[in-house]
Every structure is written in C-alpha cells, then in structure tokens.
Amino acid sequence: MSQLKVGFCRLDVTPPLGIRLMGNNNIRRAENILDALEISVMALECGETKVLLVSMDALYPYEHAYIRQTLSEKFGIPQEAIFVHGTHIHTGPMIDRHFGSPESPVAAASVALQTPDLDKDIEKIVSYTKVFLNKVVDAADY
C-alpha cells in the first residue's frame, strides 16, 4: 500500500494600494487593506500519482491554463491533475497577463475600462499579475 504524502503552502499576494480592483464592472481602486489576499497550494502524492490544488484570492482564475501549463512543465505533473480555483473575491485586482490587449478576457468582458489612467492601470495590473503568477510557482515549489 502506498503512503499518502501531503504538502501545503500559503503565500501573501496582497497587491499595492491604488491598484484597480475587479468586480461589479465599476472602476474601483484598493484604498486600504482589511485582510491579506493569499494563494494556497496543496500537493498530494500517493505512489506515482501526484495532484496539485491551487486556490487563489481572485475573482476569476483567468490565468488557469497558464498556471496549469507552467506547473506541469516545472513539476512533471499532468495538467489534468492540477486544479485551479478562484475564491471569486470582488475586492482583489485583475489577474491578467494580457490586460489592455485584445487577447485579454477581462478587457473583452468589461465595458468600463476607458479611464484617464488606463495606461497606468495596464502597467500595474500586468506587473502585479507577473508577481502573482511567480508566487503560485513559489508556493507549489515549497
């Protein structure tokens, strides 16, 4: 009988104040921090079978395919065994590597993107997304 091995890591991914928030199709920015935003990763291994469970404080896990592919390549776990979940939080930033471009699912879904600060928003969101995605890998590597 194989032994079940379990690993768990939780990392803080609280964004900087002023970043644009996602949800309700309104332009809102982070003005304060009530609770930290987090990424949690649980790794399960039993014999040859490995599974990763990724939970992230985000409205939607738009980057789920990228996360699954990246973790699969790094750890040799089939993408079908990597489960990505968003907590559907309406007080967190957008997680979108392509924000501001036609490839962005967020841009396609939002009618309220045009603001005087859009260029700054794009830069902040893309930058935060890179940090966020790196922390997903860090948590899985823990």
What are these regions (language model features)?
Residues 1-142:
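Conserved beta-alpha junction segments in alpha/beta enzyme cores
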